[in-house]
Swiss-Prot record:
PANTHER family: SNRPN UPSTREAM READING FRAME PROTEIN, SNURF (PTHR14508), SNRPN UPSTREAM READING FRAME PROTEIN-RELATED (PTHR14508:SF2). The modification Dimethylated arginine is found at R108, R112. PROSITE patterns: SM. CDD domains: Sm_B. This is Small nuclear ribonucleoprotein-associated protein B'. Its main location: cytoplasm.
Amino acid sequence: MTVGKSSKMLQHIDYRMRCILQDGRIFIGTFKAFDKHMNLILCDCDEFRKIKPKNSKQAEREEKRVLGLVLLRGENLVSMTVEGPPPKDTGIARVPLSGAAGGPGIGRAAGRGVPAGVPMPQAPAGLAGPVRGVGGPSQQVMTPQGRGTVAAAAAAATASIAGAPTQHPPGRGGPPPPMGRGRPPPGMMAPPPGMRPPMGPPTGMPPGRGAPMGIPPPGMRPPPPGMRGPPPPGMRPPRP
């Protein structure tokens, strides 16, 4: 059966309808759809049925059940009447428009990325690494060099250190004069011409303990070859 646009069924869409079935039950709900077999779809539907008492003295009572969305078969339908007009919000778009301002309860997409104008978090001062180009070795030190260049630089540094004059603290005078050549110390006779002056004690040896073994004291001839020199003061000579 073809349903025309002028059908009475189309005029009752979204109305509250009362539908009575063959078994006496009553369904009241919002009429949403139908077909040529008179199968109906009701939303927000309530069921009302009358329960007969067991005793004749008791009155017949009515029971109500909330069903929700219901599909009624047309073969069980007896009558269909209008219960009330459609709701006032019928036809209003429930999807928010693109230009409309969102209110509470409207879902919004989660933000992606960092919003503009928000400062980036920075690490504490003790945990932050050095700034690029600051706090590390210079670029000249990190530049790779050949073996000859490194050796020449090391030799130049050693020569500059060895040739630098030694500075002594003020108030203590200059370095002692070299021993072995030049004028003898006061209190000693000069050696005859053509004879080397005796060697003094080595540098750093405390005075008063004599000369080391093998070197005679000043003014004394050295022992002949193959013979030991005199023992130092305070030491007994070896037994024969």
